[in-house]
């Protein structure tokens, strides 16, 4: 990828019984899972083959820790049925608004009054062909909350939890396989489908 290219993939890490501290994460088991999504088959195939090449090899991640890839498998994404879906954010949602005049960033969360507008603006950037559907979509964010994460030495505001979205079926499926928000390739915005249904 060229630095300015938008990277068409996303990922999330699942730890078992994690405890988060200011300078470390303690886990209940010595294994974890990584979910990797790529909406384009060719991109997914390239990464999957790369993963297999490094299977069973040690990767040192700190002075006293290393990780080993023990298994990799392809899982077909479930299709959303209907126009309403309940999603879980497996990795935090980042909505970034950049001010070119002073070169600063604002990160919008579910606690901000303009969350819905900024989220829709972000979706239109990533899914321009669904612009009208995005205008008409409805969201329930009552099960979401604001959080703060450390990203390359900076603390940024994010949103976590479960979101319900009522929108065009094709848009919902596109959001599921492509992920949403900003910084997807850095491990943000990956959605997991909990359930879907048709709302009249």
Q: What function would you assign to each model-found segment?
A:
Residues 1-200:
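RNA-interacting cores
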